[in-house]
């Protein structure tokens, strides 16, 4: 039993605050974790990247290694990375990067580093923000209520099978396609069979959440 909300605005506006109100109204649908896929004002150059670090204490060193994967693909940070100032062990990181020569190839390399810094979204305007706890708590921690954009998705999760963690939360980025995010409510009964088939074709999964299969 999870909760899903969506919002579209004709012109850029307070999409974060609107989605927060929608998610607060269905907090009874699940409060293990909450996530938002927010579409803001597109960057003129490069991509917005959201990532999750499981170990805040090593974040600075991990970002340097992450930067090396960017440089290997003809990219680099266009701005200094920023992250939340919470006291949790994990940290949500926001980056603006130059466009890699081949986005899919860079994502494959970056995913090998996911134990240290997991890419959760890439796009011209998409930013996926997700974390443990209720919508209001997640929004306050990450400033969701101040986000300006045109559309977005929200998801309140009540975990049934896979773990409760920031990375297993919804929404999911449809890697490696920029600006594509999904949320899902339900259970995919042939998840493991389908996952095994896709892994044999070279697809990489970051969690055991069946929604990632979509």
Per-region residue spans from a language model:
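Conserved short alpha-helical segments that host acidic/polar catalytic motifs at enzyme active sites
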Residues: 1-214
């Amino acid at each position: 039993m999870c909760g899903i909300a969506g919002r579209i605005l004709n012109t850029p506006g307070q999409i974060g605050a609107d989605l927060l109100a929608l998610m607060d109204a269905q907090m009874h649908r699940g409060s293990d974790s909450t996530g938002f896929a927010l579409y803001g004002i597109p960057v003129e150059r490069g991509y917005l990247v959201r990532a999750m670090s499981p170990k805040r204490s090593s974040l600075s060193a991990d970002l340097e290694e992450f930067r090396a994967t960017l440089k290997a693909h003809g990219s680099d940070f266009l701005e200094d990375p920023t992250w939340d100032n919470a006291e949790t062990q994990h940290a949500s990181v926001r980056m603006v990067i130059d466009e890699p020569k081949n986005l899919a190839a860079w994502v494959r390399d970056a995913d090998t580093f996911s134990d240290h810094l997991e890419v959760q979204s890439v796009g011209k305007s998409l930013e996926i923000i997700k974390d443990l706890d209720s919508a209001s708590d997640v929004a306050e921690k990450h400033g969701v209520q101040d986000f300006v954009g045109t559309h977005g998705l929200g998801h309140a999760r009540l975990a049934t099978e896979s773990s409760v963690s920031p990375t297993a939360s919804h929404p999911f980025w449809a890697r490696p396609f920029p600006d594509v995010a999904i949320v899902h409510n339900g259970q995919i009964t042939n998840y493991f069979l389908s996952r095994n088939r896709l892994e044999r074709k070279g697809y990489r999964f970051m969690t055991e959440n069946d929604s990632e299969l979509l």
